[in-house]
């Protein structure tokens, strides 16, 4: 990270660091998790090290470089990336596609109290080009030299897992029963053959998340005003449920399932 920034400084270039939206989870204990600024968490030890490394180390290195050298250096906090809007292809070996595959392999999916904000990969790519100024953009140029700004590459249009996504999957042709989350984990564990049940490979991961009675996740609310002003592709959010995109995901997975 430091060598990359040093090279960018010598070449009078710019540096954009792709962080993760999960880094903002560290801000839950701060004044505002929605803030589009770099902050210093005082309770970071209570959260996972993976997020800590991004918010407290990598993100702050970028911020320090921008503040002390005058170079353009920005952090892009990127949310959950999904398949593209044209073909719907989404890597079937990722955790979410594997989870959804149990609709086909086991005939079940869990009922989750979760709010989601997925963003198609091609929209993410376009937004990065806009925010970085590679695609000419007066607003991103105007914000370029403000070292405190963090861009949230997020979808401001959210949807609900059980109320929105599961019906959309059924409308896309998948037939499955909806189980309480702990029962879904038990069903997942009941078929140990990874050829019949590829999702079993992530049993520990899903058991840790869902084999409990913890309340659902409402998700973080991100400050999007500055990001959307500099990225036309993100302005107003991207609709996933009512555009046929879920059906394209399922169609792209069908030959692989």
Locate the predicted segments by residue.
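Amphipathic terminal alpha-helices
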Residues: 217, 221-257
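Residue-level signal for the nucleotide or nucleotide-sugar donor/cofactor binding architecture
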Residues: 53, 94, 119-122, 159, ...
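Short, flexible loop/turn elements at secondary-structure junctions
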Residues: 20-23, 77-82, 120-125, 154-157, ...
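Conserved Rossmann-fold NAD(P)-dependent oxidoreductase catalytic core, especially the SDR/UDP-sugar
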Residues: 1-52, 74, 81-87
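Phosphate/diphosphate-binding loops
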Residues: 52-62
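NAD(P)-dependent short-chain dehydrogenase/reductase
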Residues: 48, 63-136, 168
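Secondary-structure transition/capping motifs at alpha-helix termini
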Residues: 3-14, 65-72, 134-145, 172-176
């Amino acid at each position: 990270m430091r060598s990359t920034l040093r090279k960018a400084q010598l070449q009078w270039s710019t540096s954009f660091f792709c962080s993760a939206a999960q880094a903002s989870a560290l801000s839950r204990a701060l004044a505002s998790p929605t803030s589009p600024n770099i902050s210093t968490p005082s309770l970071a030890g209570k959260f996972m090290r993976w997020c800590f490394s991004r918010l407290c180390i990598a993100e702050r290195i970028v911020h320090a470089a921008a503040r002390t050298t005058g170079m353009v250096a920005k952090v892009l906090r990127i949310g959950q990336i999904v398949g593209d809007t044209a073909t719907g292809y989404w890597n079937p070996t990722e955790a979410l596609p594997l989870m959804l595959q149990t609709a086909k392999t086991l005939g079940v999916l869990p009922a989750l109290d979760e709010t989601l904000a997925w963003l198609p990969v091609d929209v993410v790519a376009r937004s990065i080009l806009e925010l970085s100024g590679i695609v000419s953009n007066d607003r991103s140029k105007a914000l370029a030299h403000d070292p405190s700004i963090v861009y949230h590459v997020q979808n401001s249009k959210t949807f609900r897992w059980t109320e929105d996504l599961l019906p959309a999957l059924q409308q896309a042709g998948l037939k499955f029963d909806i189980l309480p989350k702990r029962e879904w984990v038990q069903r997942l564990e009941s078929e140990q053959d990874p050829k019949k049940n590829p999702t079993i490979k992530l049993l520990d991961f899903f058991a840790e998340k869902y084999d409990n009675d913890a309340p659902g996740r409402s998700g973080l609310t991100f400050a999007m005003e500055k990001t959307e002003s500099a990225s036309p592709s993100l302005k107003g959010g991207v609709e996933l449920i009512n555009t046929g995109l879920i059906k394209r995901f399922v169609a792209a997975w069908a030959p692989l399932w």
